[in-house]
Amino acid sequence: MINTKVEFVAWPKIPRAVLGTIVITEKLDGTNACVIVQDNEIVGVQSRKRMLNVGKDTDNYGFAQHVFDNQEKFLELGEGSHYGEWTGLGIQGNPHCLPEKRFFLFNTRRWGEHNPPPEGIYVVDVLYQGEYSHEVVDATMNSLLESSKEAGYKPEGCVVYFPKLEAMEKHTFEYSKGKWLGDNK
């Protein structure tokens, strides 16, 4: 017997094993942040785990206050949820030696040299874009380690984005299995 009261839910299409083009960006060591813009209004500010608000106990390293103080710039981002990393002075030991706190957008398809973000908002660096291989990821990590030594900062690692799968994975120099598992390099 067929139940006509149940709504059909299709099984998702499974992509082929060929991963195709990837984008590797630098993983910044800060705190995850997001600004939500709807109807030309900032309707939300959040961290990775919670909504934020201006105030000592409701903010996250001053990100909500920064958004409040710079609303016009953040509204220039347009509609949507704009995820990124809030990093710099006073956050995670400031391993990039930034002179102040900065917000770096993750979406390199939307933002970058081809479409610069508003002044005072940054974009994570694209380190590689092309075909996927383990060797490419390893070479990119090694290159980042060398270039960061020359620039005088300590990198956290890379994020590999698979556009075909709309998925990401992170590769870190320390705690490759997760920082809560102790020393597991």
Task: Tell me the role of every PLM-derived stretch.
Residues M1-K185:
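Core nucleotide-handling region used for phosphoryl-transfer chemistry
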